[in-house]
Amino acid sequence: MRKFKLVDETIWRESTEVYDYKEETDATEENYITILKAYENGYVVEYLENGSRLFIDCVASVEEAKEKVKIAVDKDITFED
């Protein structure tokens, strides 16, 4: 399990930190990745498909997040403050 050092408590939900991945799926405009928390060494991201949460994951980069968009599994996330 990856551990992430917290940068701050800011949660971005409707911001510029939203990445569209419809070009990588048979997606609608409601498919996107949102960064929930930013850490020094990665991000916690939420994947939505058709407006519903698909899963949440910890990733080191936005590129890694985009590679995982087809993995529809729930994940437990642990944090190191």
For every predicted segment, state its role.
Residues 30-54:
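Short aromatic-glycine-(Arg/Gly/Cys) micro-motifs in beta-strand/loop hairpins
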Residues 29-30, 63:
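Low-complexity, intrinsically disordered regions enriched in charged/polar residues
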Residues 1-29:
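Negatively charged, low-complexity tracts enriched in Asp/Glu with abundant Ser/Thr
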Residues 2-9, 47-81:
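Mixed-charge, Lys/Arg-enriched low-complexity segments
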